[in-house]
Amino acid sequence: MCKDKNEKKNYEHVNANEKNGYLASEKNELTKNKVEEHTYDYDYVVIGGGPGGMASAKEAAAHGARVLLFDYVKPSSQGTKWGIGGTCVNVGCVPKKLMHYAGHMGSIFKLDSKAYGWKFDNLKHDWKKLVTTVQSHIRSLNFSYMTGLRSSKVKYINGLAKLKDKNTVSYYLKGDLSKEETVTGKYILIATGCRPHIPDDVEGAKELSITSDDIFSLKKDPGKTLVVGASYVALECSGFLNSLGYDVTVAVRSIVLRGFDQQCAVKVKLYMEEQGVMFKNGILPKKLTKMDDKILVEFSDKTSELYDTVLYAIGRKGDIDGLNLESLNMNVNKSNNKIIADHLSCTNIPSIFAVGDVAENVPELAPVAIKAGEILARRLFKDSDEIMDYSYIPTSIYTPIEYGACGYSEEKAYELYGKSNVEVFLQEFNNLEISAVHRQKHIRAQKDEYDLDVSSTCLAKLVCLKNEDNRVIGFHYVGPNAGEVTQGMALALRLKVKKKDFDNCIGIHPTDAESFMNLFVTISSGLSYAAKGGCGGGKCG
């Protein structure tokens, strides 16, 4: 199944979303594996009930394997727990997008609805109602996953599991440490994901702050909130909280959205600032102190301020505490607690594998974990030689103005191919629905109450390789519905689309996505790439 770890490989490293993915550019001759006679309790023992673990377990069972899946949620620093489904369903993608949607509604009501003829009196948001709606939907998904495992003939145990040796797992049912039981498995998959990190060197942070593990089930409205971090999680949380009407400040060490295209990152931040999110650049908390029902935050610039809520979103670490990996001498990156696994999901222990966020150098995205888990199961139990391809993986960030990306950033393309070999086509423009309400002021134009000086809300950007007939290696879009716009473009990039293919394609009018069919200005030309007139992303004549 797994090659000798000392064998030298020549992999092309493609960092699809600047999250350090691999590209398996060669077809490896894999050792075929068939389920042996039942010398183990199970053919496949999966630790972790997130997207990757569940997908791999069900795929293995579909090919005749006897599968056992463990899932147990250790409480957050504030005691928050949740059901099966992992981060994405419970404290990640799903609740995040629902709250983003709620915030987007609020922005439309407050900023745009009056101009479109709607009248609202005493518009007010109910945080508790939002949390109830979100959590009710999550519980329905938890239930569907349980029934899905059962119908797939995957045995499920709500137990805290750890490794005893390369084929033995011990566990504590429902986390009860008074009784330990063991099972054996021919293969073991670790798919425990990651958990948010709170720094040890900030006094009071672990005791008084929350993370994304807590915000989506917070019983009391967050009030005035400090978000610490520059990650996409930090910007998404601060964005929807601001849109819901809360006073939000973001404390940033240096740049936002490190690893993503920085022109797009700056545009996202600028839009958030225009909507009222405040940023403390280069300023971080040094100490948190409880003051009645508030939190006093002392900053690195010697200032201090009171907040109702402090949310840390500075990064995530692999959830491997208690797995007993050290006794097996498993290779782990100690700086982020991630398991070192190759492009085949193999660890340095032949019978143990790792997929999803807990694996080193893998994009932290649920669809990536699902695909990798399914492919691994097919290799183990179906004699497949399929290999996970980590190139051109799309992603979307659900900030107030969304950002979708696939492939290389402008900076990464310059680094890998040289600036002279890269051409960047781009255009800034205003979304049609927004520009109808928030028109930029002109001296001779008739004025009305909706005039507002706003920067161009949208950006369309293609990063191309000159020596390959301008093959597109990077797609970037800042604007509404970024995920929907980006998904189809990812397929085009995987099929090696070229700039001329975009030029020859007819756009759907009027949409923001059609802007990619009308990109003619390059960064190297030095010309303005701001659209002059038009209808959103398209031309009107």
UniProtKB/Swiss-Prot annotation:
PROSITE patterns: PYRIDINE_REDOX_1. It catalyses: [thioredoxin]-dithiol + NADP(+) = [thioredoxin]-disulfide + NADPH + H(+). Disulfide bonds join C88-C93, C535-C540. The active site is at H509 (proton acceptor). There are 2 isoforms resulting from alternative translation initiation. The displayed sequence is likely to represent the shorter isoform. The lineage of its organism: Eukaryota, Sar, Alveolata, Apicomplexa, Aconoidasida. Residues 438-452 are annotated as: Loop important for the interaction with TRX1. Its EC number is 1.8.1.9. Keywords: Cytoplasm, Disulfide bond, FAD, Flavoprotein, NADP, Oxidoreductase, Redox-active center. One of its GO terms (molecular function) is thioredoxin-disulfide reductase (NADPH) activity. Binds 1 FAD per subunit. Catalyzes the transfer of electrons from NADPH to thioredoxins TRX1, TRX2 and TRX3, which in turn act as reductants of disulfide containing proteins. Able to reduce nitroglutathione (GSNO), a compound involved in the transport of nitric oxide (NO); however, TRX1 is more efficient in reducing GSNO. Has no catalytic activity towards oxidized glutathione (GSSG). FAD binds at residues 51-52, 71-74, 87-88, 92-96, 161, 357, 364-366, 509. It is an enzyme of class 1 (oxidoreductase). It comes from Plasmodium falciparum (isolate FCH-5). It is found in: Cytoplasm. It comes from the Eukaryota. Its cofactor is FAD. Belongs to the class-I pyridine nucleotide-disulfide oxidoreductase family. This is Thioredoxin reductase. Its main location: cytoplasm. InterPro entries: FAD/NAD-bd_sf (IPR036188), FAD/NAD-binding_dom (IPR023753), FAD/NAD-linked_Rdtase_dimer_sf (IPR016156), GSHR/TRXR-like (IPR046952), Pyr_nuc-diS_OxRdtase (IPR001100), Pyr_nucl-diS_OxRdtase_dimer (IPR004099), Pyr_OxRdtase_I_AS (IPR012999), Thioredoxin/glutathione_Rdtase (IPR006338). The gene is TRXR. GO terms for biological process: cell redox homeostasis; cellular response to oxidative stress; glutathione metabolic process. Homodimer.
